[in-house]
């Protein structure tokens, strides 16, 4: 039977009324913005400013970068199971924010960014995003409850995608007022700010609620 969309919406709003579910959505919305900024600005910066050949950029990001991203995804799942979803979620995305901020510092600090920094950043940053994203998936599944749990999980994915898109839309205003190095540093601080929400994202209360409702 096809469920009434209004009932699904009601269940979804009820599910997000739980503090851990709401704060997790808020955390995701703010924390993924720099991923959108990075994905939009990095190819242009590497080819136009650092002088990389577009083919070389694609080979590095699609070769070693993609391989480390794959390993990061596996590692993120293992670490989330062992050390906790929230901790690894923030470790992954937070490490990316710090790494991108340090990259911004190097852009400002060097007349020509050393090649090893250019190469290292391009290869390593996708792994940190992957670690955090897998842990985020795990957290989203734990937080998704009520009869609209599938829709709720999809909502978390949509919030993450929306955050990335917002980041790409910010490129115009940001580049108008800030240099590339300053943008990376600004995004680091902006995306680390939601760290105070982590303590409110404990899924245990919702996990217990799901267990009780299934009994």
Language-model features: where?
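Helix-to-loop junctions at the C-terminal end of transmembrane segments
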Residues: 71-88, 175-176
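Short amphipathic helix-loop junctions that connect adjacent transmembrane helices
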Residues: 40-58
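Pair of pore-lining "gating" transmembrane helices in MFS-fold secondary transporters
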Residues: 17-38
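C-terminal ends and interior cores of transmembrane alpha-helices
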Residues: 94-112
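Multi-pass alpha-helical transporter architecture, strongest
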Residues: 185-215
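A late C-terminal transmembrane helix in Major Facilitator Superfamily
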Residues: 146-176
